[in-house]
């Protein structure tokens, strides 16, 4: 393909539809696998590298971040949860965010709303990621403190003081937990379930959780994947590790004319053209393939390599 050769707009649109359809199919399939108790499967309790609550009806897995918190507050080291997160991320970066996470699916569905989408710049993305950093910090501090008290057998007073925050702090206000566990519990999908974060009455904490969920989904209608960008502590961990993943994105400089179509369709606001062509090592990249499908010059591709070091922006 020469610099003058371009794929027609019709073919680009068709490729984007195919990628979106494939991704939606895989997201729904994985959601069904995670909730395989519907089909009679047993609960495994295995941590999956997605944001999903342990208390969701029919789930056979738990979200790795929930397992990370729960293990710490139980007085143990979260080797399994962290191992799953790091292993998956070192291989595929944040691809699970783009192709497997149930709350990512929820955001993608909301993103179809006919609203004028906004493209926050890199500075805003970096500044607002403070919330994800704060959530991670709270999880670690509470997890280590409660875990240490539990290990020594002196955790009763601490747990009484922290209440529902003493087991898995982020799960208490996680919009994924509200959407997939609390709301189904409230509408009676599984009346025998008993968990303190399910909130069996419509108290103030329930309404605060619901308000946070609504605020997140409203924001997502205008800023695609806003929760993944700014609020998800699991995404924060995976993004930093993903800069060194074996599977990544590269750009062919001989084909690329820097038209910017790739950046316009990126749901995470990655500034692809700011990176060296050998590897786009952005912590926000979820390998959704939207940019690959949108490029009229076929200049972008998924590559498999061992990065020598994290690519620095120009």
PLM region descriptions:
Residues 253, 297:
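Aromatic-flanked redox-active Cys/Sec active sites in thiol-based oxidoreductases
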Residues 275-288:
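Short linker/helix segments within small regulatory modules
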Residues 266:
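Walker A/P-loop NTP-binding motif of AAA+ ATPase domains
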Residues 228, 259-262, 285-291:
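Cysteine-cluster motifs in flexible loop/terminal segments that predominantly coordinate metals
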Residues 2-231, 236-247, 270, 292, ...:
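Membrane-embedded alpha-helical bundles of multi-pass integral membrane proteins
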